[in-house]
Amino acid sequence: MKRTFQPSNTSRKRTHGFLVRMASKNGRLVIKRRRAKGRKRLSVQVASK
């Protein structure tokens, strides 16, 4: 049986990235909550060269 988590940086960024969050009202609320909480990372960050 195939596992449910098949890591891919592309799909990770496309679904949970900062720009995607900012694109909708609810996404902006997520960012706002994380800022208020003092999170170091507001959204997923994929290491790039």
Swiss-Prot record:
Disulfide bonds: none annotated. GO terms for cellular component: ribonucleoprotein complex; ribosome. It holds the Pfam family Ribosomal_L34. Gene3D superfamilies: 1.10.287.3980. This is Large ribosomal subunit protein bL34. The gene is rpmH. GO terms for molecular function: structural constituent of ribosome. Transmembrane segments: none annotated. Keywords: Ribonucleoprotein, Ribosomal protein. Belongs to the bacterial ribosomal protein bL34 family. GO terms for biological process: translation.
